[in-house]
Amino acid sequence: MEPPDARAGARRAPRLLVLALLLAAPPGSKAEVRLSVPPLVEVMRGESVTLDCSPLGTHDYFMLEWFLVDRSGARHRLASAELRGSELRDKELNSRGRSPPYQLDSQGRLVLPEAQVGDERDYVCVVKAGAAGTAEATARLKVFAKPEAPEVSPNKGILSVMDDFAQEIATCSSRNGNPAPQIMWYRNGQPLAVPLEVNSEGYMTTRTVREASGLLSLTSTLYLRLHKPDREASFHCSVHYYLPAGQHGRLDGPSFSLTLHYPTEHVLFWLGSQSTAEGWVREGDSVQLLCQGDGSPTPEYTFFWLQDKQEDVLKTSLEGNLTLERVQRNQSGTYGCRVEDFDVPEDAELSKTLELRVAYLDSLELSAGEELSLPLHNSTTVTCSARGLPTPTLYWTKDSAPMGEDPTLSLHSVTFDSAGTYTCEAYMPRIPLLSRTRSFRLLVQGTPELKAKETQPKAEGSWTEGDEVTLICYARGYPKPKLTWSQLGGSPTEPAPGGQGWVSSSLTLKVTSALSQDGVSCEASNPLGNTHHVFHFGTVAPQTSQAGVAVMAVAISVALLLLVVAVFYCMRRKGRPGCCQWGEKGSPPPGEPKLSHSGSQRPEQTGLLMGSASGGAKHGSGGFGDEC
């Protein structure tokens, strides 16, 4: 086995040869080798990167070496090789514990698989080309890592706006980035320009930590002096990081708000229940009084009722509401709310008052009772009285038809048309759903008024005896009239369709000649009198005899039947000699024997009888005998 020193000497032999060639170069010759090496190479963490080192021009032979420059400036060889023509020989690699190890490709370029933050160094490429000389160039590797999304820890406590110094708002952290990212703070979407120097208005502090992986984590804490408008502000932080080729990225953290302590400055006091603009509520309703101050935390509220300039405390609570159940008219007055906030100056006015007006409307009173009887053509007045607050408006209706706005109803020379239901209604235009009504019924006394429904005859101009007719009478009055007829069969008196006090009765009968003389009368009566109407029928035509018409119809029907039978028989015997032919004087055809029957029997009948008696003697399709 060959000793190690011998093998090392064999490897050094070509290098010594190259060195000898370089030393043997003619004096005065100019050696020049130029390299193409990118001064800065950028890569994302975890990606593979290749560092190029290419001599410019044509060189049949050169020696290539790659060095790593540490933080102290010392060089450490990573790889070496010789290039003869296009063939790379005698490669040597020293990974210095890197995993995965460095690689050298076929063109002498240094390959770093899965770039890490620790690979951020200067890499020196040295080329020795014999007589052409020696050259070296440095490539700086920059490794970028996208940081994790920011995590925010807001201050969960209650922050006072009355403090005159900046308070801690929140802390924002971003981990594992490279190079170190930047953290910015925002309020309502607008960036906060806060310095790093401590002051009373606002500043921020930052801290950077290098993790074991070589990545950087950044933490920023925001301090601000708070004001009352910040109670509705939205805060968040964002991380700005760098990418290759001058690009930038941004990651936003979740937004948050703060819980602030600030004194009450304004108080609102209003009616929460349905009410008018003037503060009117209906008697019997439940009324809610609402009070709200703009301080935080929620202050204490005191509700009171002013009576003779003295406060009658009704309730003290944190809810800011007071409910008055089923308010009455004597609860009208001035109500107030006061905010008990001990953080405000003593001279601050933190109370409000409002006027509560309870609207009421008592039952209506009429000068007439529920029913008013008045003789026909008499006159009277009815007065409607209402008591309420605010003053109600009165108007009258008759059977739901409006009559006008006036507390007094005047009835002049009443007729039966005046009878009906009169209603007085009181309402308040400014207060919805507050109204009352009171009604009375007017009864007009008098002899009944009668109206008949005339009928017209069926035949134009006159009635015919036996025609059926229905007669109808209508009547109205008070007391209620009764309808009777001069003939039996009238229907009972019933209210007529359409109302208005009318009643009706009907009678159905047949017209006779006796009715044409006397007619039919209808009478309406009540204790005050009666009225009647007579239905006249005029001339009544006698009825046509129905028996003669029936006999004539039967005779015509029989004659038509015999004619049809004769025609049918002749058509069946058409073409036979002597058939269906008679002499001029009605004698039988020649050659036929004379019948010994009575002379009243006709030949056609004889022929039919003979044919029928012949039984099975059939010829042709007729089915009758051969005799005519």
From Swiss-Prot:
It is a single-pass type I membrane protein. Its main location: membrane. Residues 569-628 are cytoplasmic. Disulfide bonds join 53-125, 172-237, 291-337, 384-424, 473-522. InterPro entries: CD80_C2-set, Ig-like_dom, Ig-like_dom_sf, Ig-like_fold, Ig_sub, Ig_sub2, Surface_Rcpt/Adhesion_Mol. GO terms for biological process: angiogenesis. Residues 580-628 are annotated as: Disordered. One of its GO terms (molecular function) is laminin receptor activity. One of its GO terms (cellular component) is plasma membrane. The keyword Nucleotide-binding does not apply. Epinephrine-stimulated phosphorylation of Ser-621 by PKA enhances adhesion to laminin. Ser-621 can also be phosphorylated by AKT1. It is found in: Cell membrane. This is Basal cell adhesion molecule. The gene is BCAM.
